Amino acid sequence: MGFLWALFSVGLVSAAQLLLRSAMVALPPLTDIVAFLQHLLHFQPGTVGLFFGLLGYLLSMVCWYFALHRLPLSKAYALLSLSYILVWAAAIWLPGWHEPFYWQSLLGVTIIVAGVLTIFWPVKRR
């Protein structure tokens, strides 16, 4: 069950990253604090993404709490790196994001996957 809690946490934190990114693009910069607060108070575009992005982080932390009670930290922490892969792929494939694809990035993602698989590879006891 700890594995599932960790995967829920990874999914939530990945979605939260994407929501926060879209919110930050839509909201005015914090250097103009008055405009930023007005956007928040009047529920301008970006406000909902900011709210749900922060909520996603909170729910992810709750899932992470349950995951850490049921999984060794070394395995649970390795699963967090899957979030990098999800966010990278979503930023490339989701319409409107226009993130460029680089072969070098794909190599990095492949190394991350290999690392996670190595950590989760069953160890034969003698």
From Swiss-Prot:
Gene Ontology CC: one annotated term: plasma membrane
Keywords: Cell inner membrane, Cell membrane, Lipid A biosynthesis, Lipid biosynthesis, Lipid metabolism, Lipopolysaccharide biosynthesis, Membrane, Transmembrane, Transmembrane helix, Transport
Membrane association type: Multi-pass membrane protein
A GO term for molecular function: carbohydrate derivative transmembrane transporter activity
Cytoplasmic topological domain residue ranges: 69-76, 122-126
One GO BP annotation of this record: lipid A biosynthetic process
Residues that span the membrane, as ranges: 1-21, 48-68, 77-97, 101-121
Metabolic or biological pathway, per its Swiss-Prot or TrEMBL entry: Bacterial outer membrane biogenesis; lipopolysaccharide biosynthesis
Domain of life: Bacteria
Subcellular location: Cell inner membrane
Regions of this protein lying in the Periplasmic compartment: 22-47, 98-100
InterPro entries per record: Flippase_ArnF (IPR022832), Small_drug/metabolite_transptr (IPR000390)
UniProt keyword Ion transport present: no
Main localization, broad class: membrane
Quaternary context: Heterodimer of ArnE and ArnF.
Family per record: Belongs to the ArnF family.
HAMAP family named in the record: Flippase_ArnF
Function description: Translocates 4-amino-4-deoxy-L-arabinose-phosphoundecaprenol (alpha-L-Ara4N-phosphoundecaprenol) from the cytoplasmic to the periplasmic side of the inner membrane.
Protein name: Probable 4-amino-4-deoxy-L-arabinose-phosphoundecaprenol flippase subunit ArnF
Gene: arnF
